[in-house]
Swiss-Prot record:
Protein name: Argininosuccinate synthase
Enzymatic class: ligase
Binding of L-citrulline, residues: Y87, N123, R127, S176, S185, E261, Y273
Biological process, per Gene Ontology: argininosuccinate metabolic process; L-arginine biosynthetic process; urea cycle
Keyword S-adenosyl-L-methionine: no
Domain of life of the organism encoding this protein: Bacteria
Chain positions recorded as L-aspartate binding sites: T119, N123, D124
Residues that bind ATP: A9, Y10, S11, G12, G13, L14, D15, T16, S17, G117
Upper lineage: Bacteria, Pseudomonadati, Chlorobiota, Chlorobiia, Chlorobiales
Molecular functions per Gene Ontology: argininosuccinate synthase activity; ATP binding
Keyword Amino-acid biosynthesis: yes
GO cellular component: a single term: cytoplasm
Coiled-coil stretches: none
Protein EC: 6.3.4.5
């Protein structure tokens, strides 16, 4: 009788390397190790060799970068999704895609169980397992970090050495870091004190604003229906565009974010983020919307943006709610086409200009010069009707005082 198979979300780090051996022994199962590339800069070479040497029966490496940009990042950008008005949701956007890829590989390989390396007090366990429930409820889910006997990194290293598991036992960074093309999440260590400034060694890619160039960078960003398509007049694929903005933005100290956020599991957590491209694109996109969206649509969309950010953060990407909100958002983006010019200087993003064939700004109506075409006399009747309700309320209040 063939053994059961477990599909494991594998990073090659200490936790998931130990996990291969631990799961294999505990469940007497074959392990299918799965790694997804979302644009992280950390070493991805030799992962297959390492996974097999650790005990995996097979390994799958999936380049998900293009799908991540087109299916996850662009919808979130068009939605204006910033969790609690700050976090551009880099990690939160990536988890459902990795979970979906894990499910796909599991089904292809006739696996009966799914496993991940998320901790028991974080958001990612929710994001993975809610996605599993949405896409493959028939598969059992294993979360070793919630149940295994290891209580420290040192205990895991000892287990790895005992079983000849090839892992690095060098001194660990005091920070917990997660990275993809849309941003980097940094936590733990001294960052757990919200009053302590983030040390420079916590930042992975951005230059300190104080040490950034004294000469600003000016960039033209072109959008078509809410999606960025060109930089400085050069048409670019989404992945390349984000890579370039990350490079330029990081050099100028743009994209450093420090927030205390409300986690899914009910606790507050201090997080440091680096997201140069996301910061620049969200800023430019929002300014183009100010120019092209009708007032009531622009104001109502702010509510939708928060709802969209919440569902991403909470792990309900594969949900009817997201599909419904996508319908509204797509309708709003039909006119969000144009060019936005921004300046990057010592950590800041400043608007220099914007233009669009769908611009609702009418200079003849807005001007205070002789070219003014606004009907000033119409204002008197408008104000009378606009304030009629308050006038009536005031009169009734006075009569009953």
């Amino acid at each position: 009788m063939s053994k059961e198979k477990i599909a494991l979300a594998y990073s090659g780090g200490l936790d998931t390397s130990v996990m291969i051996k631990w799961l294999k022994d505990k469940y007497d199962a074959e392990i299918v190790a799965v790694t997804g590339n979302l644009g992280q800069e950390k070493e991805v070479e030799n992962l297959e060799e390492k996974a097999i040497a650790t005990g995996a029966s097979s390994f799958a490496f999936l380049d998900l970068r293009k799908e991540f940009v087109e299916s996850c990042i662009w919808p979130a950008l068009k939605a204006g999704a910033l969790y609690e008005d700050v976090y551009p949701l880099a990690t939160a956007l990536g988890r459902p895609l990795i979970a979906k890829a894990l499910v796909d590989i599991a089904l292809e390989n006739n696996c009966t169980m799914l496993a991940h390396g998320c901790t028991g007090k974080g958001n990612d366990q929710v994001r993975f397992e809610v996605t599993f429930a949405s896409l493959a409820p028939q598969l059992a889910v294993l979360a070793p970090l919630r149940e295994w006997e290891f209580t420290s990194r040192e205990a895991e290293i000892a287990y790895a050495m005992e079983h000849n598991i090839p892992v690095s036992a060098t001194k660990k960074s005091p920070y917990s870091i997660d990275e993809n093309i849309w941003g980097i999440s940094i936590e733990c260590g001294v960052l757990e004190d919200p009053m302590t400034p983030a040390p420079e060694d916590a930042y992975q890619i951005t230059t300190s604003p104080e040490k950034a160039p004294d000469k600003a960078a000016v960039i033209d960003i072109e959008f078509e229906q809410g999606v960025p398509v060109a930089l400085d007049g050069k048409a670019m694929e989404g992945l390349d565009l984000i890579v370039e903005l990350n490079k330029v933005g990081a050099a100028h100290g743009v994209g450093r974010l420090d927030m205390v956020e409300n986690r899914v599991v009910g606790i507050k957590s201090r997080e440091i983020y680096e997201a140069p491209a996301a910061t620049i694109l969200h800023f430019a996109h929002r300014e183009l919307e100010r120019l092209t969206l009708e007032k009531s649509v622009f104001q109502y969309k702010k509510n939708v943006s928060q709802d969209y950010a919440n569902l991403i953060y909470n792990g309900t990407w594969f949900s009817p709610m997201r599909e419904a909100l996508d319908g509204f958002i797509e309708a709003t983006q039909k006119t969000v086409t144009g060019l936005v010019r921004v300046k990057l200087f010592k950590g800041s993003v400043t608007l220099l200009g914007r233009t669009s064939p769908w611009s609702l700004y009418n200079e003849d109506l807005a001007t205070y010069t002789e070219a003014d075409t606004f009907n000033h006399k119409a204002a008197e009747g408008f104000i009378h009707l606009y304030g009629l309700g308050l006038k009536t309320w005031s009169e009734v209040k006075a009569n009953n005082s």
